[in-house]
Structures are given as structure tokens and as C-alpha cells.
């Protein structure tokens, strides 16, 4: 296939040349790129000029890891990198060899109980009760492009020149189990994607009780482990600690990836910051129970495992059956956490998210939930929509409460038919009404749930996950449907498809408001109950795939009580997700900063809500609420009819601003400038692809009087370009100075009906100055009233718009 011009340009800028039209091999200087195999030494070298991943077949036939990191020159023999030493208390493989022990070897598919005492990547429980396996190299193949994973989300290619995939087959001869290990390397990204397919070619069934997606054995533990953790309403806070001897891990056993831990970690050197130093990012494309674990042994090597949580997995693999693990994505950066994040952003934006909405600017929406909760009528909804239309909003979303007997959270889930008392003309009618107002119409669903007070449950009480004879736990008075059963998924699909095919629905918000308990499926035999959690997630993916394929024009936004399932697996189906149920601007700063470690701006749902905020009771300026929410898909979650005329004018200005800059914000290059986890200020910026426009956000959490001078060093600009700088609070203003030093503020466009927020506009500066000296963010408050209308205080914020002249 023909490589795209843009990809050619990218590769040529890096000095990369394709060797011939008939091969997928490349060269950068004298470094050959692609997947290289040295037959004599049985060594594999995956390289693209940015990274190298080197493996070899070990003396016992297992697959060993020799190197992962910045690209190095290829050679025939890397065997000197295999460290074999005699140590006290080692156990050895061969009678006449006191050097080769798996206890000290870095491996690709480590197993249990054969001289390696570290955690295994796979455990196979056999009919005789043994868990011992011996996966030996059989063969390999190299394919252009990237194969699709069966029934699972994964990254993809659009043409074969983008990547190469190595498939190495290992086999345990006693059981007949094959492990097909998949490694994909991109031509222009420092990325390796890894997964494993297990095939039972034996004659007896076995049980996979551990089946991680990847193992990465590192030669030293001199890294800091970074995780994104928290709870409901404070998801993905950054937690960092040193790796040390022993085991540390994050994971979920809740049935979703969870608010508590995101399926992502980063390993960084102690001196690594946003812009320099080594960092390795590991992200699991999965939405269910997971575990990512680091184990440092007595020889100071570090083993990283990532995949399905083995605590809740017991998969029966019959003869002739196969099992595919989720995909793990590994990113390497030698330019700090910023480069690591940008790599994830571009990959997930362009080669994980799919469909018509992947590259489109996202509509500015208003959601009625915090405006009405369950207390709404058709007329109340129309009034909210009409005011939103006046402000320039594009999409109205009807949230929970429109269906069945749903007037509280005690009833109605599972009955996806409009409540005639609230919506006399049904969803068709309210959708038409909203369209007549001039807005697109969106609708909330919670497909995976039911209430016991529902027609669905009364008809099929055995359709929930529930243990016979045991009490059923509830969350929000609701119960989890057994999505491991095809007939359950079929029924929900039929109800949703009927609405989407008859009503003018342009957007769907898919929610999940509780975790799974009593995970037992009435449709599975006793020896397959350990499959229920994973089969449940496969059912979720199946429903998503059917709906997004049948209704490609519909924009799907995922949600799970906010960010409880904000993960790459769902991003494959829904290009944006509700980042958190916490809409407080101050709390969202940390949540969104942490989320940006892995996820692109275009994936983050962010709304302006009312004050006092419904989650924190905090009051923040309207401009700050907007300045935080701009950096995502943007919308409102309040009743605009309750705002003052001045606030409405400010909202109009916010909507105009977002429409002008949303493509840059959602699809530009994102840089973190100052961390809210380290100080009471935060900064980030987005730069357009041509580097002619940049939008910089600065936030203050708590104000300090008579504060020191502050600057933020910017990134990604053209060092030779001269940038004008406009500072926006609610709208842009210009500033002039009188002879006695007083400032005069004037509206940029002179519109009297806009909210005037006093700000400063700095002089034009060259890109190199802004990147090396920084943008001055000091305020002028002396800690006393001066008569000048200069914004200062808690929860302040500014936007700086830089444009190359």
C-alpha cells in the first residue's frame, strides 16, 4: 500500500529512508529499521530509529529479553547482554550447567515453578493438578501492518506501511498449549503493542489462571513508579514512589477498570521531568478487572506485568479453543513525561479511537442532569434548550429519568421506553422538539443495569449477576445484567436500536453507575464461573460494536459514575468519556492534569457547572470554570435560565471562543507546564500543528498576598516566530497605560454586551524567549485594595492566546 504524504514527510524529517518499494524495511543513517531476525543467534531486533526491543531464544528454548530502550545499532550477536552468573542458592535447569538459571534471566513469557521465583506471566492448571509449563520456541512470522484482535479493542493501522507485527510461537509440548506472542512496532512512533493468544492443541482441557498481556523485565529498578489513582469524584491523581525490593501493584476487581486505579503506569528516572529524561509508559487496552505489577528481586532487576487480574480469572480452555489477552501498549521516551504523553495522545487519538467522530471537532453541549436531576417536564427541557440555543450551544443531552417508571433511582432501569407522563410524544417527539429549537439531541442510557422494580427484571429475574441462595447486593438500588449471556445483550441492543433508528438521536451517553458484586452467571457451569468477569466485558464490547457499527453517525460518550471506566478499551468505541462526576473547576484541574498523562484532550468530557458546586459546595468564577472546561470536549451542566444577564453574555463569549479554537485545543499538541500536585498553581498549553497558534492556561488554586514573581516556560513554539499575546478572562481585552502609570482596559471588539473581565495583554515575544525565559504570570496585587480592577484571589485563571505574526 502507498504511504501517506504526511507520514512520508514525518519520516523524511527524521532522516528515515525506505529501502525499496517491495519491503517494509527502513533505514535511518546506518541504522536499519523494522523487525530484524538473526538466524544464527536466534535474535530478534525490533527498531524504528527511536526505540529498540531485542529478544533472543534462550538455551532452554524460552524467549528472553536483552534490551528495551532508545534505538541502538543492530548487530548479529547480542549474546553478551545475557547475564549468566553462578549465585548461592540458585536452582539450575541443566545437570552439567551451574550458570543457566531462570532466576536471573530477563524473559518474555516467564512461567511458574521452573527456577524462576518471580511472578509468572502465565499459569496453566492441568488435569493432573500441575501448574508447571515449558513454553519453547517453535517458529515466528513477520507481517506488514497489524492484525485485529478477536472480540477485543486494540490499536490499528490504516495501511501496512505504518507498522510491522512479529508473531513468535512458543509451545508447551506436554499439554499441547501454544502461545502466539504478538509484537507490533510502528514506523514513526516509539511504541510497542503486545498481546498473547493461547491455543489448546492438546487433547485435554486446561485452565488459564494467570494470563497477563505482557512482561517487561528491566535490568535495574532505578525508576519511580507513577500511577493514576483516586476515588469517585477525584479520579486519576498522580501518585509517585520509588521502586524497591518486593512487589507493588495497582488493579481492579470491581468488574470495571475503576475510579480507584487507571490501567496505566509510568516508570521514570529520578531526574526525569516533563521535558527531559527517560520514561516508560504502559497502558492496558481493557475495561475490566486488571493488574499492573512491578517486582524487584534480590539481583535488582524489575519485572513489570500487565493484563487481566489473575485474582478473578479462571478460563477453561478446551481442546481446539483459543484465548486472546487484551493488548498492552508500551511507550518509550527519552524526552521526559511530556513526549511520552504526546505519543499516547497521538496514538490513541488516531489509531485507537475510530469512526466518523474520530477527527471531528466535538459539539458544544448542555446536559440537563445537574439542572433538573429527576425533576423535569417537557416544557422545562425545552426552556433549557432554548436558552442554550441563544448562547450558541449545539447539542442538548437528556440525562437519566426519561424512561420506564424512572422518577427516582429506585426503578425503571432496563425498560428503555419513554415515560409517557414526562414525555407524552416519546423520544421521537422530544428529539423533534429539540431539533426545532435548533439543537441536536442526545440521550442517556445505562445499558448494563436494571432495577428490581422494572418490567425487564420481573420478566427475567435470572438475567442479573447473582449467586443462587445468596443475598443480592445493590448499588444505587440497581443490579448488574449478565452481559456474558448473548440473549441479554441481544435484548438490550434491540431496545436501544429501536430508539436510535426511529428518533433523531445524534449523541448517546452510556453510563455505568455501580461496580459488580456476586459475579455469578446462571448460564455458566461451575467450572467456568471464573470466566464470568471477562465474558461480561466481552459482552459490553459486543454491544458497543453493534451500536457503533449500525449507527456510525451517533457520537458516543462513555461514563461510569464519571471516570470509573475511563480507559483505552472504551475509547476504541466511544471517542470521548465523562472524565469525572466532579464538575468543580478546582478539583477538575488535578483530575484533568493526571488524565493527560495517557489520554488525549479530545477524549475528555468537561462541563461548566453551577456554583456553589454540587459536589464540593465551592464557588469559583465563571471564567475559571470555563477556562478549565475548554481543554476537552466542552459543555454546560446547569440551567442557563438561572444565570444573570451578565453571566449569559459571558457564556456567549465562552461559546464563541470555543468554536474558534476547539480544533486546536482538541487536536493540537498538549504540554503540561506546572503541576497542581506540586504547588498552588497549574499551567498547560496546546499548540497548533503549524505552531502558529498556541493557547496557554494558567490557574491559581489559593492566593498568596505579596507573592513572588512567577513565570511559565512554554514549549512547542517556533523559536524564530514573533508571537502576539492576548490574555482572556471571559473575553479578550487590550490594555494601555496613562502617563501616570494607570491601566485602561478596553474590549478587543468593542462589544458592549460582552462580559468584561480585566486582564493584561503583554508585548509580542519571540518563541525562543517564551520557551527559555518564560511567560510572566505574576499578578500586581500588593495585598491591599489599590483601586485597580486587577483580578486576583483564590481560583483565579487566565488564558493566553499566542499567534505568530
Residue ranges and their predicted role:
Residues 451, 456-490, 534-641:
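Glycan-recognition surfaces
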Residues 394-402, 492-525:
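Active-site groove signature of glycoside hydrolases
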Residues 357-494, 507:
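Aromatic-lined carbohydrate-binding/catalytic grooves of carbohydrate-active enzymes
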Residues 50, 196, 320, 366, ...:
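Conserved, mostly hydrophobic/aromatic
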Residues 265, 274, 676-719:
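Carbohydrate-binding surface patches
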Residues 123, 130-137, 315-334, 794-802:
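Short Pro-Gly-centered flexible turn/kink motifs
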Amino acid at each position: 500500500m502507498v504511504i501517506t504524504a504526511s507520514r512520508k514527510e514525518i519520516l523524511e524529517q527524521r532522516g528515515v529512508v525506505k529501502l525499496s518499494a517491495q519491503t517494509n524495511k527502513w533505514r535511518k543513517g546506518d541504522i536499519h529499521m523494522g523487525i530484524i531476525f538473526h538466524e544464527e543467534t536466534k535474535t530478534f531486533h525490533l527498531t524504528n530509529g527511536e526505540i529498540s526491543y531485542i529478544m533472543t531464544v534462550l538455551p532452554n528454548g524460552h524467549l528472553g529479553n536483552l534490551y528495551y530502550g532508545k534505538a541502538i545499532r543492530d548487530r548479529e550477536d547480542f549474546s553478551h547482554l545475557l547475564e549468566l552468573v553462578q549465585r548461592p542458592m540458585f536452582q539450575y535447569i541443566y545437570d552439567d550447567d551451574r550458570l543457566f538459571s531462570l532466576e536471573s534471566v530477563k524473559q518474555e513469557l516467564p512461567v511458574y515453578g521452573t527456577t524462576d521465583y518471580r511472578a509468572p506471566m502465565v499459569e496453566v492448571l492441568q488435569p493432573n493438578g500441575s501448574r508447571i509449563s515449558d513454553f519453547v520456541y517453535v517458529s515466528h512470522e513477520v507481517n506488514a501492518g497489524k492484525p485485529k484482535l478477536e472480540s477485543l479493542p486494540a490499536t490499528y493501522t490504516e495501511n501496512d506501511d505504518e507498522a510491522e507485527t512479529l508473531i513468535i510461537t512458543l509451545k508447551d509440548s506436554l499439554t499441547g498449549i501454544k502461545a502466539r506472542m504478538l509484537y507490533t512496532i510502528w514506523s514513526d512512533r516509539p511504541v510497542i503493542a503486545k498481546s498473547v493468544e493461547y491455543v489448546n492443541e492438546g487433547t485435554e482441557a486446561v485452565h488459564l489462571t494467570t494470563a497477563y498481556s505482557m512482561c517487561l523485565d528491566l535490568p535495574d529498578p532505578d525508576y519511580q513508579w507513577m500511577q493514576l489513582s483516586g476515588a469517585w469524584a477525584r479520579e486519576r491523581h498522580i501518585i509517585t514512589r520509588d521502586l524497591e525490593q518486593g512487589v507493588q501493584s495497582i488493579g481492579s476487581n470491581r468488574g470495571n477498570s475503576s475510579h480507584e486505579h487507571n490501567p496505566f503506569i509510568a516508570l521514570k528516572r529520578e531526574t526525569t521531568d516533563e521535558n527531559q529524561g527517560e520514561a516508560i509508559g504502559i497502558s492496558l487496552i481493557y475495561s475490566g478487572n486488571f493488574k499492573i505489577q512491578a517486582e524487584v528481586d534480590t539481583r535488582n532487576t524489575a519485572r513489570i506485568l500487565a493484563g487481566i487480574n489473575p485474582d478473578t480469572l479462571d478460563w477453561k480452555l478446551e481442546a481446539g479453543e483459543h484465548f486472546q489477552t487484551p493488548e498492552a501498549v508500551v511507550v518509550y521516551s527519552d524526552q521526559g513525561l511530556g513526549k511520552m504523553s504526546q505519543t499516547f495522545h497521538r496514538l490513541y487519538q488516531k489509531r485507537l479511537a475510530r469512526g466518523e467522530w474520530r477527527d471531528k471537532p466535538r459539539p458544544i453541549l448542555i446536559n440537563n442532569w445537574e439542572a433538573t436531576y429527576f425533576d423535569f417536564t417537557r416544557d422545562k427541557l425545552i426552556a433549557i434548550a432554548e436558552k442554550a440555543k441563544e448562547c450558541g450551544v449545539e447539542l442538548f443531552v437528556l440525562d437519566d429519568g426519561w424512561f420506564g417508571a424512572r422518577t427516582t433511582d429506585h426503578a425503571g432501569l432496563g425498560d428503555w421506553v419513554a415515560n409517557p407522563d414526562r414525555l407524552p410524544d416519546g423520544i421521537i417527539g422530544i428529539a423533534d422538539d429539540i431539533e426545532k429549537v435548533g439543537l441536536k439531541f442526545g440521550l442517556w442510557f445505562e445499558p448494563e443495569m436494571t432495577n428490581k422494580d422494572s418490567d425487564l427484571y420481573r420478566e427475567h429475574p435470572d438475567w442479573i449477576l447473582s449467586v443462587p441462595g445468596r443475598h443480592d447486593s445493590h448499588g444505587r438500588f440497581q443490579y448488574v445484567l449478565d452481559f456474558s449471556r448473548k440473549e441479554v445483550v441481544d435484548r438490550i441492543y434491540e431496545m436501544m436500536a429501536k430508539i436510535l433508528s426511529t428518533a433523531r438521536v445524534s449523541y448517546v451517553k452510556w453510563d455505568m453507575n455501580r461496580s459488580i458484586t456476586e459475579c455469578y452467571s446462571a448460564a455458566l457451569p461451575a467450572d467456568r464461573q471464573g470466566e464470568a468477569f471477562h465474558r461480561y466485558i466481552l459482552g459490553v464490547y459486543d454491544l458497543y460494536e453493534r451500536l457503533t457499527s449500525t449507527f456510525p453517525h451517533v457520537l458516543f460518550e462513555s461514563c461510569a459514575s464519571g471516570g470509573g471506566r475511563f480507559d483505552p478499551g472504551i475509547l476504541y468505541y466511544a471517542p470521548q468519556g465523562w472524565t469525572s462526576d466532579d464538575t468543580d473547576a478546582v478539583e477538575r484541574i488535578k483530575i484533568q492534569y493526571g488524565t493527560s498523562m495517557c489520554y488525549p484532550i479530545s477524549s475528555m468530557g468537561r462541563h461548566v457547572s453551577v456554583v456553589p458546586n454540587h459536589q464540593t459546595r465551592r464557588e469559583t468564577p465563571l471564567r475559571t470554570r470555563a477556562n478549565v472546561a475548554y481543554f476537552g470536549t466542552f459543555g454546560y451542566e446547569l440551567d442557563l435560565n438561572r444565570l444573570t444577564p451578565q453571566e449569559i453574555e459571558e457564556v456567549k463569549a465562552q461559546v464563541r471562543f470555543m468554536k474558534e479554537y476547539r480544533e486546536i485545543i482538541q487536536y493540537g499538541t498538549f504540554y503540561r507546564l506546572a503541576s497542581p500536585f506540586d504547588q498552588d498553581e497549574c499551567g498547560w498549553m496546546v499548540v497548533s500543528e503549524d505552531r502558529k497558534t498556541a493557547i496557554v492556561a494558567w490557574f491559581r488554586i489559593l492566593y498568596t498576598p505579596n507573592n513572588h514573581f512567577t513565570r511559565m516556560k512554554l514549549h512547542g513554539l517556533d523559536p524564530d516566530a514573533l508571537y502576539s499575546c492576548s490574555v482572556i478572562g471571559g473575553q479578550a481585552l487590550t490594555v494601555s497605560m496613562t502617563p501616570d502609570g494607570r491601566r485602561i482596559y478596553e474590549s478587543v471588539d468593542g462589544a458592549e454586551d460582552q462580559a468584561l473581565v480585566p486582564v493584561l495583554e503583554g508585548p509580542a515575544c519571540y518563541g525562543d524567549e517564551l520557551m527559555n525565559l518564560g511567560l510572566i504570570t505574576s499578578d500586581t496585587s500588593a495585598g491591599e485594595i489599590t483601586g485597580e480592577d486587577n483580578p486576583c484571589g483564590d481560583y483565579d485563571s487566565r488564558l493566553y492566546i499566542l499567534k505568530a505574526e
